[in-house]
Amino acid sequence: MKKVMELVDVWKIYDLGEVKVEALRGVSFEVFEGEYVIIIGPSGSGKSTLLHILGCLDRPTKGKVLIEGEEVSRMGDRRLAQVRNRKIGFVFQSYNLLPRLTALENVELPMIYAGVPAKERKRRAKELLELVGLGDRLHHRPNQLSGGQQQRVAIARALANDPVFILADEPTGNLDTKTGEEILELFRKLHEMGKTLVVVTHNLEMVDEGTCIVRIRDGRIEGIERRGVVYGDT
């Protein structure tokens, strides 16, 4: 299997003057193409910090982060922004859609930054919205959509540049049970399509869906389970 991401002995230390906080302590793991990775752990375990490192939104204090074999942890800001735009698709708990743009325009946005021609990006945005079941909501703005529909737009946007992997932060966290199940089904569909998914969640149903479960506690990897094989402490 092709390795799409790797963390090697990653530490994140926050210097708060007299106190140093070790948010991540020697984290190492790999993500392979087509995996459905679920990251779980209690509050304060380092999940949010790990999410930021995985998404190239923050840099490790020490250690390496590699995407498709290329070390990204020491890249300059401009190059790192290109990596985020082209190789990572983000899905946030709060959707993060631009309120003045339509669903179609929100999905087009990452492609504009990537330099995709207007005709092609409109075609692809429409195709992606149809994929997530919103072919009849192309020209609706976020305030005209339900929470579940907004999250579907966010998922379509995440797929816009055909990223190496999708990184999702509590994608069902703001949704009711029924709508959350619909989003869960959509992630299931993406996994079946061969997409690589990395999800931070408390949703136990999502944990059941994952092909790789990463458990984090006190800034360390407590264990990694892959299809019945367990690595690390149990």
UniProtKB/Swiss-Prot annotation:
<protein>
    <recommendedName>
        <fullName>Uncharacterized ABC transporter ATP-binding protein TM_0352</fullName>
    </recommendedName>
</protein>
<feature type="domain" description="ABC transporter">
    <location>
        <begin position="5"/>
        <end position="234"/>
    </location>
</feature>
<dbReference type="GO" id="GO:0005886">
    <property type="term" value="C:plasma membrane"/>
</dbReference>
<keyword id="KW-0547">Nucleotide-binding</keyword>
<dbReference type="GO" id="GO:0005524">
    <property type="term" value="F:ATP binding"/>
</dbReference>
<comment type="similarity">
    <text>Belongs to the ABC transporter superfamily.</text>
</comment>
<dbReference type="GO" id="GO:0055085">
    <property type="term" value="P:transmembrane transport"/>
</dbReference>
<keyword id="KW-0067">ATP-binding</keyword>
<dbReference type="InterPro" id="IPR017911">
    <property type="entry name" value="MacB-like_ATP-bd"/>
</dbReference>
<keyword id="KW-0813">Transport</keyword>
<dbReference type="GO" id="GO:0016887">
    <property type="term" value="F:ATP hydrolysis activity"/>
</dbReference>
<dbReference type="Pfam" id="PF00005">
    <property type="entry name" value="ABC_tran"/>
</dbReference>
<dbReference type="InterPro" id="IPR003439">
    <property type="entry name" value="ABC_transporter-like_ATP-bd"/>
</dbReference>
<dbReference type="InterPro" id="IPR027417">
    <property type="entry name" value="P-loop_NTPase"/>
</dbReference>
<dbReference type="GO" id="GO:0022857">
    <property type="term" value="F:transmembrane transporter activity"/>
</dbReference>
<dbReference type="InterPro" id="IPR003593">
    <property type="entry name" value="AAA+_ATPase"/>
</dbReference>
<feature type="binding site">
    <location>
        <begin position="41"/>
        <end position="48"/>
    </location>
    <ligand>
        <name>ATP</name>
    </ligand>
</feature>
<dbReference type="InterPro" id="IPR017871">
    <property type="entry name" value="ABC_transporter-like_CS"/>
</dbReference>
<dbReference type="InterPro" id="IPR015854">
    <property type="entry name" value="ABC_transpr_LolD-like"/>
</dbReference>
